[in-house]
Structure formats: C-alpha cells, structure tokens
Amino acid sequence: MYVHGTHVAGIAINNNPYAEVMVARITFDHHAIPAPPTVEVAKKAADNYMATVKYFQDNNVRVVNMSWGWTLKEIEGMLEANGIGKDAEERSKLTRDIFDIYKNGLFNAIKSAPEILFITAAGNSDNDVTFDEVIPSLFDLPNLITVGAVDQAGEETGFTSFGESVDVHANGFEVNSYLPGGNTIEMSGTSMASPNVVNLAAKLLALDGSLTTSDLIELITGGAEKSDNGRINLINPMKSVELLKTVKKKS
C-alpha cells in the first residue's frame, strides 16, 4: 500500500540534504468493487482538501507534490460497478454532480495558497487531460505546474497524458527510488515525473529560500527545453540554476 508514496518521496528529496518532508496521506479504495462515491463523501473530501492545504500553510510548506488525480470516468466507473443509477443518463448526471464537488473543492484549496507551489502528475492515459477531465492536472492556476513523462532519451512515454495544461516534462520511465524498508526499485509513470520537478524546485529553494512561487515557476519553465514539435518541454536543472545565478547578479 505504501510503495507508491515512498517511491515518490524518495525521488522528491534525492540528493538534497536540505529538504524536509511533510506527509499528507491519501488512500484509495483498492477493492474489486470500490465503495460507491456519494455527494456526501465528495463534500467531505472537498473539506479535507482545504484543511490539508491549511495544514501546509501553518507549517510553512513551500512545494507540494501531487502524484495522484481523479477523472470523471473513474467516478462513473465506481457508480456503475455498484449498480447505481437506473439508467446511463441518471448515472451520468450523478457522476457530474459528484465530480464537480471534488473538482471545485480541490481547485479552491490550491487557489487559497498562492505562496505554495503545487506540482502534479499529468496522468497515464495517453490522452488529453482536458478531454479526460483529469483533476488537478487540467487546472489553470498560477501556483500549479502539471508534469508529463519522458523516457531516459527525452522522448514522450507511451503512457503520458498531454495537452495545453501540461507545463513541463521530466523522466518518468523506470525511475529508481526507495521502497518501504530501504530497498530500491524502478517504477514508471507521471507519478515519478512529478517529484522530479519537485526535486528541482526544492533545490532552487535550497539555493535561495526567498524565491516566490512565481519565481520558481519562471526558473523551472524558463530553463526547460522545448522539442522541435512543441509537445515536450523537458526540465533542465542546470539551466534553471544558471537562470537563478543570472537573476541574483542583476539584483
């Protein structure tokens, strides 16, 4: 159960002795037939999103990794698996009602903390995040970066989601990191790409703790290298650090 979170955290703090980690635990239902989503459950989740972000603010968190997400299809699939809805039309309406509560709750929670940089995985559907309605990766917020995955050669992986809301890319293929207990394993997914960007943001903050959220985004996206076809915007930590040095000299 804890493999994913441990692996992601290991990537986020790799080779950064100055990084401090705060955990906000999210668990998902892994039963063959998951518990049915309801409006009440969605409202509780929305409240929890806001409370969690407040917890981050109270503890001066600067960067948050989100290697997870929800889609409209997932909600509908859970309703269908539980036989909820007398027909497809009724189930579709209930799906939308529930999903929008999650969506608006998460959007408002992230928006409420402009001083925190949120970095999220684009998703692994090999589809457009807007078409799939993936949250939070479809959000357009000034304190959010959405990350797609490339392989070690810098090419898009076969699974990465894409679209206009995907800001940068990072390695998400066979990334080595820790398991609970200290052993290591290679795992793939945009879940592994996102903490690579968190790792860069944390190292930039280690170099200059006064950087704002907008400064971090400028340095990360400004140092990234866009592919010839425009689909990939691959982070380049060395370039981002050079940009930081240039900014410091000017100031």
Regions found by a protein language model. Name each.
Residues 1-44, 141-143, 154-155, 161-165, ...:
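Subtilisin-like serine protease catalytic core
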Residues 6, 11, 70, 124, ...:
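Gly/Ser/Thr-rich helix-start
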Residues 6-10, 47-54, 58, 104-111, ...:
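Solvent-exposed, polar/charged alpha-helical surfaces in well-ordered, non-transmembrane soluble domains
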Residues 15-16, 25-28, 68-70, 170-172, ...:
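Short, small-residue-rich loop/turn micro-motifs
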Residues 17, 127, 184, 225-226:
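Residue-level marker of structural boundaries
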Residues 27-137, 153, 182-188, 192-194:
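Substrate-binding/access-modulating region of protease and related hydrolase catalytic domains
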Residues 63-67, 208-251:
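C-terminal subdomain of the subtilisin-like protease fold in secreted/lumenal serine endopeptidases
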Residues 115, 121, 129-206, 210, ...:
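Extracellular S/T/G-rich loop segment that most often corresponds to the catalytic His/Ser-adjacent loop
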